[in-house]
Design a protein with these regions (language model features):
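Active-site-proximal alpha-helical segments within enzyme catalytic domains
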Residues: 174-181, 219-242, 287-304, 316-318
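Active-site SXXK
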Residues: 58, 75-101, 128, 178-182, ...
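Structured C-terminal helix/loop/strand segments within mature extracytoplasmic catalytic/sensor domains
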Residues: 2, 283-352
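Structural helix-adjacent loops and short alpha-helical linkers that scaffold large soluble proteins
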Residues: 31, 96-100, 138-139, 183-195, ...
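Active-site Gly/Thr loop motif
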Residues: 251-301
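A small/polar active-site loop signature that marks catalytic segments
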Residues: 134-211
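Active-site helix/loop module of the DD-peptidase/beta-lactamase fold
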Residues: 76, 95-133, 157, 188-221, ...
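N-terminal leader/targeting segments and the immediately adjacent pre-domain N-terminus
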Residues: 1-75, 91-99, 130, 328-372, ...
Length: 381
């Protein structure tokens, strides 16, 4: 097991705005050539990877962002936000605010009469966590956001096609209800609840979370954060909930959340679980934080590609095989540094990306026209 994360000293020149210490890849026991191979494979496959951070042996061992993306620029996170939601529920359980076997409808008695249907009273908080509420199909975040009335009321209107706990059906509606329950219990949004308990202890700042019609954070998406913030959530779980000497999350919760639960062998409590003893939070367009407990490593990636299944084979081809280098190698580290520098700047000089003078007067600006190539959204300009 590699070294735990310690606070970076204020004078540590390797620490950046995120407060995480840095090492060269080989000093952290990572093969620099494997990282180069990963980037080369992704590029040759035509995958749009925007940035990544790799943590091992108590420090960030490699990182890079492709222009115009950068470390300090936050992203609108999709379903990877669910893993933050799981942390909030774990904290609420520790504080005695709720039990996993508590019926969901019990938190919203005002909907009990209109929501009456067989099986509903058997649906528990744990069924929300494990995506086994009994629905026939997914309710995506995009569908959810089109609803202008109470999302809680709409959730209880969805028919139960299966007994709760019987079948895994991935749905962002379940994550929303976890957030709604927390807000009902605390009077706070999940974001405000997590601020002093998770975000501030981890040095996460500048984050934000959307709010739905009920005054509730979506839970399953809508969190705005950086790649480093994703990495920190993974590091926290790698370390059984400990962060720089403080037990931020209960260790038993971390272990429960990141192993298979409910009817699916590949899903825990809002975390995806793999056969190779790794686990990951995953969001649309390949927003992922993957934890390698047996190797003391965490990999966070941000991209714009359809389906994580396109990137995962390239990850698996190089990680965890890259871990376990025993001797620092300055020459290999220099090759990696050069590759990352080229990756970061290779598009910056493209002629079509150069700044241009749009005009200085209102009349000139009104003459500007922008057009778009064919796209699924039907945007023409």
């Amino acid at each position: 097991m590699s070294a735990p994360l310690d606070a970076a000293p204020a004078t540590d020149p390797t620490a950046r705005h995120d407060g995480l210490p840095r090492k060269t890849a080989s000093a952290a026991g990572v093969d620099p050539d494997a990282v180069i191979g990963f980037l080369d494979d992704v590029e040759q496959a035509g995958l749009d990877l925007h940035g990544f951070m790799l943590f091992r042996d108590g420090a960030v061992a490699a990182e890079g962002w492709r222009w115009p993306y950068a470390a300090h620029r936050p992203r609108n996170l999709h379903s990877v936000a669910k893993s933050f939601t799981a942390s909030a529920i774990g904290l609420a359980v520790r504080e005695g605010l709720l039990r996993l076997d508590a019926p969901v409808i019990g938190f919203f008695p005002e909907f009990a009469e209109e929501a009456r249907q067989p099986g509903l009273e058997a649906m528990t908080v744990e069924h929300l966590l494990t995506m086994s509420v009994g629905h026939e199909s997914e309710t995506s975040g995009a569908v959810w956001r089109g609803i202008k009335t109470s999302w809680v009321r709409e959730f209880f209107k969805i028919p139960l096609a299966h007994a709760p706990g019987e079948r895994f059906v991935y749905t962002s509606a379940a994550s929303y209800m976890l957030s709604a329950i927390l807000t009902r219990l605390t009077g706070q949004t999940m974001h405000d609840y997590l601020k002093p308990r998770l975000f501030e202890p981890l040095g996460i700042a500048g984050e934000a979370w959307d709010v739905g019609p009920d005054g509730v954070n979506p839970g399953g998406n809508g969190l705005v954060a950086t790649t480093a913030d994703l990495l920190k959530l993974g590091i926290l779980h790698l370390q059984d909930g400990a962060w720089q000497g403080r037990q931020v999350l209960p260790p038993d919760w971390v272990r429960a959340a990141t192993r298979a639960q409910g009817p699916s062998a590949g899903y825990g409590y809002q975390w995806w679980v793999y056969d190779d003893a790794t686990y990951a939070g995953i969001g649309k367009f390949v927003q992922m934080v993957r934890v390698y407990p047996e190797h003391g490593a965490v990999l966070a990636v941000i991209g714009a590609m359809k389906g994580s299944s396109r990137l995962v084979p390239h990850m698996n081809a190089h990680f965890p095989a890259a871990f376990g280098v025993s001797n620092p190698d300055a020459a290999k580290d220099a090759r990696l540094a050069a590759r990352l520098a080229a990756w970061q700047h290779e598009d910056a000089a493209a002629p079509w990306k150069a700044p241009f003078q749009a005009g200085q007067t209102p009349a000139q600006l009104r003459r500007l026209r922008f057009t778009a190539t064919d796209n699924a959204q039907g945007i023409t300009g």
